[in-house]
Amino acid sequence: MRREMQEILPGLFLGPYSSAMKSKLPILQKHGITHIICIRQNIEANFIKPNFQQLFRYLVLDIADNPVENIIRFFPMTKEFIDGSLQSGGKVLVHGNAGISRSAAFVIAYIMETFGMKYRDAFAYVQERRFCINLNAGFVHQLQEYEAIYLAELTIQMMSPL
């Protein structure tokens, strides 16, 4: 299961790079994947790369898997990409190298903001579907900070006149 992608929400999948390799094209097509978010470190760019640019729409993010990497700045972009795909009837695969830390953090952030969930609840929700997730401590801290950020934005939106 760790080397395969799992459907976290209808149309939103999380997995390792191996689930997006050339040999997995039939599986991607079977699941109806139309968009792929590829999260990798700069040093991984030679072997973790978009394999099907002619078939899928890609968002490629070069993000280090270390506790001091600022991932919050990428959340709005990834949410817009996922929302755009799902609203047009598409399906999205979010992958990193192993599908355990970076890519899981982005899926958790998406679920938190989309459904107004707290970090702990969103983490548990994703882990029920992809058991092997294990975020680095810095990403956990940033997701906990992000909870306060998006909840404050939500409060402001609710208080604003139409």
Q: Where are the regions a protein language model picked out?
A:
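Cysteine-based protein phosphatase catalytic domain of the PTP/DSP
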Residues: 1-94, 98, 106, 113-154
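Intrinsically disordered, low-complexity regulatory segments in eukaryotic proteins
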Residues: 160-162
